[in-house]
C-alpha cells in the first residue's frame, strides 16, 4: 500500500477529479446491465400469482423458480457488478467529501471545472477573477487534494480502469 500512495501525484489527483465526473453515468450503465441480466432469467412475468402454493421457506414457487433459474456464473456476474456499483458510489462520495474540505475559492473552482465541466472563461466570469487566478487557485487546490487523497483509503486504493 505504501508503494501505491507514493505513486500518487498531481496528475493522479486530476485523473480522479476528471473520472468522478463520469461516475454517475458508469453506475447507470452497470445498473442497466444488472437489470438486463436479472430480466433474462426472470420467468415470473408469465406466471399468474393468484392461488399459487407456497414453496420452501415461505417463498412462493414463482420466486423460488426464478431464483433457481439464474445460473451461478450469471449470479456471480451480477454480484460483481453490484460490488463495482457500491465501490463507485463510495469513491464519488469520498471525492466530493474531500473537495468540500477545501477553502471556498478552491472548492468553487474545482467544482465548476471538474464537476460542472465549465471552461476557464466561464469560471473567471462567474467568480470575478482572471483566468490566470482561477488556474492558480486550481493548482493550489490540486496540491492540497494530493495530500488529502493520499490519506483517504477509499480514494488511494481505487484503480481507475482506462
Which residues does each predicted region cover?
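N-terminal interaction/assembly modules
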Residues: 1-98, 151-162
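N-terminal positioning helix adjacent to the helix-turn-helix/winged-helix DNA-binding module
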Residues: 91-94, 102-106, 137
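Hydrophobic positions on the alpha-helical face of helix-turn-helix-like DNA-binding modules
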Residues: 109-110, 122-125, 134
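Short amphipathic alpha helix immediately N-terminal
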Residues: 101-118
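DNA-recognition helix of helix-turn-helix
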Residues: 128-150
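Catalytic phosphate/metal-binding cores of nucleic-acid and nucleotide-processing enzymes, i.e., regions
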Residues: 93-97, 118-121, 128-130
Amino acid at each position: 500500500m505504501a508503494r501505491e500512495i507514493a505513486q500518487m501525484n498531481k496528475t493522479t489527483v486530476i485523473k480522479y477529479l476528471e473520472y468522478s465526473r463520469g461516475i454517475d453515468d458508469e453506475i447507470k450503465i452497470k445498473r442497466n446491465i444488472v437489470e438486463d441480466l436479472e430480466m433474462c432469467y426472470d420467468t415470473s412475468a408469465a406466471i399468474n400469482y393468484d392461488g399459487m402454493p407456497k414453496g420452501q421457506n415461505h417463498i412462493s414457487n414463482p420466486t423460488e423458480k426464478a431464483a433457481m433459474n439464474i445460473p451461478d456464473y450469471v449470479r456471480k456476474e451480477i454480484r460483481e457488478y453490484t460490488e463495482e456499483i457500491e465501490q463507485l458510489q463510495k469513491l464519488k462520495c469520498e471525492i466530493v467529501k474531500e473537495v468540500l474540505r477545501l477553502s471556498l475559492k478552491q472548492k468553487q473552482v474545482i467544482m465548476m471545472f471538474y464537476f460542472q465541466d465549465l471552461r476557464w472563461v466561464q469560471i473567471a466570469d462567474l467568480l470575478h477573477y482572471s483566468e490566470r487566478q482561477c488556474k492558480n487557485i486550481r493548482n493550489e487546490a490540486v496540491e492540497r487534494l494530493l495530500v488529502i487523497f493520499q490519506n483517504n483509503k477509499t480514494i488511494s486504493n481505487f484503480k481507475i480502469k482506462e
